[in-house]
Design a protein with these regions (language model features):
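Membrane-proximal soluble domains of inner-membrane proteins
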Residues: 1-4, 66, 191
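Transmembrane signal-anchor/signal-peptide helices with a preference for the extracytoplasmic
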Residues: 38-60
Length: 217
């Protein structure tokens, strides 16, 4: 008798499952298809992104090779193309390299491209500071100290990645302008910063020694 009841129970369960399947099978299948499509789509996206990155890397290397061969105009054009079409990581590197290629034959043109990067709010703070410093390095011998100060002061703040170089450039610019007060300010800041690289600290100390003594009040 128990076996008969078991068979009846099993039949009831099968009938209930059949009803549930008949009622909800279309939803179950749809969910399964959506999961498969989502997984497939994500893997497809990952594949395409990896493919784009690999292509951009190869194109970047090819442009760098042109630069090594002193084909700067061709290299600049190649980096410009990458800056417009490559994934975001390579895009910024390409913009910086395009500016460097322009600077190799026209420093003012290179500085202008670096200034565009520095003014681009979509660019990270470190990249902006790097662009400011590279532009300033190109213009150090021709630009005024007030202009250099306006250009570089944001990069000199405590904790800024490139603050040491920015401070040294400002010290040199002030020195060139015979502004000993400003030169001393930046040299003192370089020497007093415990994280200043030793070679730069030595240069700053050498320049400090050449400054006239501070007048006693």
């Amino acid at each position: 008798v128990s076996e008969l009841f078991d068979e009846v129970d099993e039949e009831v369960r099968r009938e209930q499952l059949k009803k549930l399947w008949d009622q909800y099978s279309i939803y179950i299948i749809a969910v399964a298809l959506l999961i498969i499509a989502a997984v497939g789509g994500w893997r497809g996206y990952q594949y395409l992104e990896a493919k784009k990155a690999a292509e951009a890397g190869a194109a970047f290397d090819a442009a760098a090779e042109l630069s090594d061969q002193n084909k700067h105009a061709e290299a600049e054009a190649a980096f410009d193309k990458l800056a417009a079409t490559a994934p975001s990581g390579y895009r910024m590197l390409a913009r910086l390299r395009a500016a460097a290629e322009a600077a190799s034959h026209d420093p003012k043109a290179g500085a202008k491209l670096y200034d565009e990067i520095a003014a681009d709010r979509s660019v990270g703070a470190e990249e902006q500071d790097l662009a400011r410093i590279r532009a300033a390095g190109l213009l150090l011998d021709v630009d005024t100290y007030p202009n250099m100060l306006q250009r570089l002061e944001p990069a000199t703040k405590a904790g800024a990645t490139f603050r040491h170089t920015a401070r040294e450039l400002l010290a040199l610019s002030a020195w060139r302008a015979n502004d000993t007060t400003a030169a001393r300010q930046w040299l003192d800041m370089i020497v007093s910063d415990g994280e200043t690289p030793q070679a730069m600290r030595s240069r700053a100390e050498a320049l400090q020694a050449l400054l006239p003594p501070v007048a006693k009040s």
